[in-house]
């Protein structure tokens, strides 16, 4: 993923409330050490943006070893940024960033409104005309 390009696209929206769907480096894992989304989140926080992060596989209580040490160093206040549901991310965000190909994300972004922007970093399978939000991709 082009982290800088994703960062630039998000900043260019001028929006302040950013939702991240998917935080681990790939769907179905809780490993954050190889995740470019962690780096992106750090950059967005550095710009003072408000983040709401959802990844059903990432739970601070379950993180152990090197994975736990890594995230505590990179984003020590992660617990305050985690949302418990996808709907919470959709409801609270002006920009919704899709960071991995978890199957439920393709359906979830259909709930986004015309006022919201969806930035898809992974090229989800789409439902085309059903999507109401401003849909943007990266590198495809």
Language model features with spans:
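Structural/interface elements that position substrates and couple domains in central-metabolism enzymes
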Residues: 1-140
């Amino acid at each position: 993923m082009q982290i800088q390009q994703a960062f630039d696209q998000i900043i260019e929206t001028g929006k302040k409330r950013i939702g991240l769907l998917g935080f681990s480096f790939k769907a179905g894992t809780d490993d954050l050490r190889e995740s470019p989304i962690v780096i992106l989140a750090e950059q967005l926080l550095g710009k003072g943006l408000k983040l709401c992060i959802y990844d059903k596989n990432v739970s601070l209580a379950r993180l152990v070893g090197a994975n736990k040490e890594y995230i505590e160093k990179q984003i020590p206040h992660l617990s305050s940024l985690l949302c418990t549901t996808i709907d919470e991310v959709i409801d609270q965000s002006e920009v919704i960033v899709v960071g991995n190909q978890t199957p439920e994300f393709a359906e979830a972004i259909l709930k986004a409104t015309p006022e919201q922007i969806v930035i898809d970093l992974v090229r989800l399978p789409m439902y085309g005309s059903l999507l109401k939000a401003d849909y943007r991709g990266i590198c495809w």
